[in-house]
Amino acid sequence: MNYNPFQWTFKSEQTANEFNEHVEKSVPFYKEIHKIVKIIGGFFVEENTNVYDIGSSTGNLLKGMSNILKRNANYIGIDNSIYMNQVAMNDADSDNIKIISEDVQDFKFTNASYITSILTLQFINIEDREKTIKNVYQGLNKGGAFILVEKVNGEFVQSHEIMNQIYHDFKLENGLTYEEVIKKSQSIRGVLKPLTLKQNKRMLEKAGFKDIDTWFKWNNFVGIIAVK
């Protein structure tokens, strides 16, 4: 793999071409998370509604949901990386998949039965994150679900430090070099803005969600479901 941590950015052509390989080495249980998100979708995706993926990257989640659920719904990805969107559309094998190049905080969701955000909102500043989640809530149909997967901070300093060290060990064990791990961490300083699990849930509550639960937790990665 030719991953170059010195030039890492979501919007580069290199990142788009190598994203799938890199993310599986960097995110614990990444394939399993996608599998569960697709299974949960089976409980919520309805005919003639919209399914949105915020930060759709190479479109794998959307394509997987479209192929597995076999429902007459529109599967819409939102991503501001032109190169990611090109990869997603090149691999799209269904007419009901659409990719939109736009910043999510400016996007209006409509007629949505299911909205997902997999490790995306953590890269958006807090004010825009709150705006996005509010837009998600308003765009969901009653009974629709929002799936949020995020890297989180520990609830106190000691737990945060322990979780970070465990996560660094995970990446090294998965084949990334020490230099890649360090340089990637340096490259996202000031860009990655994780919250704690409690803070994420409070943000969902502030947007209007009342039914909120955690369906996945590994070290400093969590999956949350919020139903309107």
UniProtKB/Swiss-Prot annotation:
Keyword Repeat carried by entry: no
Group of enzyme by EC: transferase
Pfam families xref list: Methyltransf_25 (PF13649)
Bilayer-crossing regions: none
Chain residues that bind S-adenosyl-L-methionine: 30, 55-57, 79-80, 103-104
Assigned keywords, A-Z: S-adenosyl-L-methionine, Transferase
EC assignment: 2.1.3.-
GO biological process, one term: tRNA wobble uridine modification
Catalysed reaction, written as an equation: prephenate + S-adenosyl-L-methionine = carboxy-S-adenosyl-L-methionine + 3-phenylpyruvate + H2O
InterPro entries documented for this protein: CmoA (IPR005271), Methyltransf_25 (IPR041698), SAM-dependent_MTases_sf (IPR029063)
Keyword Acyltransferase: no
GO molecular function, one term: carboxyl- or carbamoyltransferase activity
Protein task: Catalyzes the conversion of S-adenosyl-L-methionine (SAM) to carboxy-S-adenosyl-L-methionine (Cx-SAM).
Record PANTHER family: CARBOXY-S-ADENOSYL-L-METHIONINE SYNTHASE, TRANS-ACONITATE 2-METHYLTRANSFERASE-RELATED
HAMAP family per the UniProt record, alphabetical: Cx_SAM_synthase (MF_01589)
Family: Belongs to the class I-like SAM-binding methyltransferase superfamily. Cx-SAM synthase family.
Protein name stated in the entry: Carboxy-S-adenosyl-L-methionine synthase
Organism: Staphylococcus epidermidis (strain ATCC 35984 / DSM 28319 / BCRC 17069 / CCUG 31568 / BM 3577 / RP62A)
